[in-house]
Structure formats: structure tokens, C-alpha cells
Amino acid sequence: MTIKSDKWIRRMAAEHGMIEPFSPELVREANGQKIVSYGTSSYGYDIRCAREFKVFTNINSTVVDPKNFDPKSFVEIESDVCIIPPNSFALARTMEYFRIPRSVLTVCLGKSTYARCGIIVNVTPFEPEWEGHVTLEFSNTTPLPAKIYAGEGCAQVLFFESDEICETSYKDRGGKYQGQEGVTLPKI
């Protein structure tokens, strides 16, 4: 597997709609203000967080169970910023919609700007032929409230292309998160 360059990312976005909306350059400023960067970088694409958030709360005193997740464990927020309580987390989604080619697997890593503040961004790989909005998980590891920004960069996607096409893609096996839109909770 080889990592793909900015030229490849631009070509795949333009010719195959791999990322929509797409920024062909790295954007570091908006309306004269510095922002957490997003867009195409040398060997990746910095994704943005949308304005939809689900902030975890324990008001119902439930047990967190990935096989039987209680959606009432979240407070839904639509805003340009989201405050995550201390030692808690929030779910969000990307502004970008992805269509991953059959020969490609991605790895997504949180941006150091957030990591240096104790905010960890977790995203699983995007598998071959998966498509949808990416559900993001922001963990606030600090004892203080933490702020995240919609419309700004939050993580970087790295694209790896195999020298051999996979036998069965995510789409072929009917992956449960195929075509997801909005913030998607756990499914079994």
C-alpha cells in the first residue's frame, strides 16, 4: 500500500467526487481570522466538523452499552461551537461526504491543535467503497470544559492505495454505516 499525494487527492475529488465539498488547497484563514486549517495537505485531507453535535450526558444514569445504546444519553446541539464537559465526549460529523474507491483504505488522525489541548479526535478507517458523512468522536480528557469549532479542521485523512483490489468491499458486504448522513450512533 502506498500513501497518496495531494495531486492524487485533487484528481480523485474532481473526477470521481471522492470528497464533497472539496477544498483543493489548505485553508488557514476565514473572514480575516485564523482558523484550525482544513483542505488538501501534502499527503492527506484535513476534514471539517459540521454544526451538528451530540454531547454525552449522564442525566439518565444509564450504562453505556454499544449493543444497546440509549440515544437519550446525548444532548443534541446545532452551533458553530460545542462545549464538551470535563472527562466527557461529543459526537459530530464531517461537512464533507466521502466516496472511497475500491482500491483505497483511509486512516484518520486527530489534528495536533486539538491534541495539545487534551481533546482527542477518534475516527475509524474508511473502508474500500464506503461512502457517507464521517461520524467524529471528540474526547475531552481534561478536568475543564473544552471547545471545538464547526466549519474548521479537526482531523486528517490519509489515503492508502493497495496494489491489489480487495475481494469484498464494505459496500459488497452491506456495511451498516454505508451512506450514513448526520451524526450516526452505534449499530449492531
Swiss-Prot record:
Q: What is the lineage of its organism?
A: Bacteria, Pseudomonadati, Pseudomonadota, Betaproteobacteria, Rhodocyclales
What is the gene name?
A: dcd
The reaction(s) annotated as catalysed by this protein in its Swiss-Prot or TrEMBL entry are: dCTP + H2O + H(+) = dUTP + NH4(+)
Pathway assignment reads:
Pyrimidine metabolism; dUMP biosynthesis; dUMP from dCTP (dUTP route): step 1/2
Going by the UniProt record, its keywords in alphabetical order are: Hydrolase, Nucleotide metabolism, Nucleotide-binding
Gene Ontology MF terms: dCTP deaminase activity; nucleotide binding
EC numbers for this chain = 3.5.4.13
Q: What is this protein's record name? A: dCTP deaminase
UniProt cross-references to InterPro entries, sorted A to Z = dCTP_deaminase, dUTPase-like_sf, dUTPase_trimeric
Q: Quaternary structure per UniProt?
A: Homotrimer.
Its job: Catalyzes the deamination of dCTP to dUTP.
Q: Which domain of life is it from?
A: Bacteria
Residues annotated as binding dCTP: 111-116, 135-137, 156, 170, 180
Gene3D superfamilies documented for this protein: 2.70.40.10
EC class name: hydrolase
The species is Dechloromonas aromatica (strain RCB)
